[in-house]
């Protein structure tokens, strides 16, 4: 064997070893991220199931808790689908429903996005026009809005699944782009509503002569919105917006934003119970139901942790409406 041939053989062997080492490293990273996604999703499913159980069967529902209930439902279904999807990727068993799971993920992501925007917008309306809100707002507005958001999210995800070949048809480039454009425009509109309403609510709290007192419910809303922006929004940008600018991202990046989206869905129940436990009496029994009620408490507290006596806004509005 000539020196040139021997050198080429050695170099070729080194290249192959480096290639297989790199592939093995990628597979290990991919599987590790998917296992983390599964663990976070299981924890999140337990938390959201607890919220669903308490709000659905053990607590009196109001205009805002209806949105929280639907948000917990969207997060629970999203985490369920993501768990199955990640296990299919790692274990590589029957993937006949692989693309169907993508449609379910899009459906619940869109629904959850809408619920967060609805919570912020409704709260903004209640403090900006309190008399109209308490006197003229239809009684079943929250349930109606949630039903419309679920229906529109389902329709949009089915159109995307059908046009992009996720369901029962072949990939149609033109129709897929058209549906993706509608979904992207819808997400931008919902995000602008969320952004403007959150800023208006923040301005009402910290600015002006008629500043509203900070309650636990405002803290809950603020943390929920912030967590969604930092953890839940990136996957929406990657899936719906980046294809329009023809930006190709690595599979590792997509796994990371998927992990962040699971953290977002898992974090909401933790936020509720954390806010409910702030300044809690140590001698008082801390049940999950009580913590959830306190997280949605809309009256400020005095130093002792009790509700402020001056906050009877809802009662005053009822009297004003009836007079």
From Swiss-Prot:
Subcellular location: Membrane
Gene: Mrgprb4
Organism: Rattus norvegicus (Rat)
GO cellular component terms, A-Z: plasma membrane
Name of the molecule in the record: Mas-related G-protein coupled receptor member B4
Keyword flag Ubl conjugation: no
Positions in the Cytoplasmic compartment: 56-63, 120-147, 202-224, 277-323
Tissue-wise expression: Expressed strongly in newborn dorsal root ganglia, adult dorsal root ganglia and trigeminal ganlia.
Taxonomic placement: Eukaryota, Metazoa, Chordata, Craniata, Vertebrata
Matching Pfam families: 7tm_1
Protein's job: Orphan receptor. Probably involved in the function of nociceptive neurons. May regulate nociceptor function and/or development, including the sensation or modulation of pain.
Residue positions with a glycan: 11
CDD domains (alphabetical): 7tmA_MrgprB
Signal sequence interval, chain numbering: none
Biased composition (Basic and acidic residues): 312-323
């Amino acid at each position: 064997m000539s020196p040139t041939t021997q050198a080429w053989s050695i170099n070729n062997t080194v290249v192959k070893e480096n290639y297989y080492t790199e592939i093995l490293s990628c597979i290990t990273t991919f599987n590790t991220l998917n296992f983390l996604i599964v663990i976070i999703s299981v924890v999140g499913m337990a938390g959201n199931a607890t919220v669903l159980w308490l709000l659905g069967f053990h607590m009196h529902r109001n205009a805002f808790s209806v949105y929280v209930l639907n948000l917990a439902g969207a997060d629970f279904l999203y985490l369920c689908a993501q768990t199955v999807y990640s296990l299919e990727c790692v274990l590589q068993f029957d993937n006949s429903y692989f693309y169907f799971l993508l449609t379910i993920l899009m459906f619940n992501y869109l629904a959850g996005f809408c619920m967060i925007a609805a919570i912020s917008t409704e709260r903004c309306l209640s403090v900006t026009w309190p008399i109209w809100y308490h006197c003229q707002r239809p009684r079943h507005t929250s349930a109606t809005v949630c039903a419309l958001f679920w229906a529109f999210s389902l329709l949009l995800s089915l159109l995307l699944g059908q046009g992009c070949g996720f369901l029962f048809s072949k990939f149609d480039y033109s129709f897929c782009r058209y549906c993706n454009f509608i979904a992207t425009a819808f997400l931008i509109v919902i995000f602008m509503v969320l952004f403007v309403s959150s800023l208006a609510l923040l301005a009402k709290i910290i600015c002006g002569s008629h500043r509203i007192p900070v309650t636990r419910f405002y803290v809950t809303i603020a943390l929920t919105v912030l967590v969604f922006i930092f953890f839940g929004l990136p996957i929406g940008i990657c899936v719906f917006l980046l294809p329009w600018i023809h930006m190709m991202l690595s599979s590792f990046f997509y796994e990371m934003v998927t992990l962040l989206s699971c953290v977002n869905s898992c974090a909401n129940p933790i936020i509720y119970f954390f806010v409910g436990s702030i300044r809690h009496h140590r001698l008082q029994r801390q049940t999950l139901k009580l913590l959830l009620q306190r997280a949605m408490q809309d009256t400020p507290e005095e130093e002792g942790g009790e509700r402020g006596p001056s906050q009877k806004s809802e009662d005053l509005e009822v009297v004003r409406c009836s007079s």
